[in-house]
């Protein structure tokens, strides 16, 4: 997801790290951001209209485009432009309508199928409140309306990491099970 919105993501490995002669520096800290700060960098959004990228992607043959990951868990879908690029409280990233249309155009151009995961963070709900589809509805509806429906979905990425992934504070495995079930009931009912 960070490739689409831009943002902090993993640095490319150095040749020395690949060769095993340079260590990966994991910092000390209370949270994952502090621990991995030296292994990450800020990236601009990728240009999904780049002809070379599209040509190379087409050469793969039948493919799935997965727009997911830990960053998806914390992304707000600002399809009506109300945020003006400012991240709402409880989220970490903003996806604009133009960025999502870029994904849909890319998927269409290369003849791929689309798989996503959805927001499940403090901006959407607290741990003691059930997940609700307010954000998911935006992205599923726009995709369907645009003619590139979402073919596959996972509720969230890396549920084994709970709060480090971006889930609400105090979120438990039981909360995840509850919310994943709610997501799939909603999905089957509205976007079978």
Language-model segments: what does each one mean?
Residues 1-155, 160-192:
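Non-catalytic accessory regions flanking glycosidase/transglycosidase catalytic cores in CAZymes
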């Amino acid at each position: 997801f960070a490739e689409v919105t831009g943002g902090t993501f993993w640095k490319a490995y150095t040749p020395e790290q690949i060769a095993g002669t340079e260590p990966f520096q994991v910092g000390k800290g209370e949270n994952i951001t502090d621990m991995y700060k030296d292994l990450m960098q800020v990236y601009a959004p990728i240009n999904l209209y780049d002809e070379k990228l599209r040509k190379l992607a087409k050469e793969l043959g039948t493919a799935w485009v997965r727009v997911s990951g830990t960053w998806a868990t914390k992304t707000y879908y600002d399809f009506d432009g109300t945020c003006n690029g400012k991240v709402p409280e409880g989220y970490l990233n903003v996806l604009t309508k133009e960025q999502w249309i870029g994904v849909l155009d890319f998927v269409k151009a290369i003849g791929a199928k689309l798989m996503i995961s959805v927001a499940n963070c403090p901006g959407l709900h607290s741990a003691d409140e059930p997940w609700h589809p307010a954000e998911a509805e935006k992205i599923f509806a726009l995709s369907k309306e645009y003619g590139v429906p979402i073919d596959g979905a996972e509720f969230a990425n890396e549920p084994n990491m709970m709060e480090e992934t971006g889930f609400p504070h105090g979120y438990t495995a039981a909360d995840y099970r509850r919310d994943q079930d709610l997501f799939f009931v909603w999905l089957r009912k509205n976007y079978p």
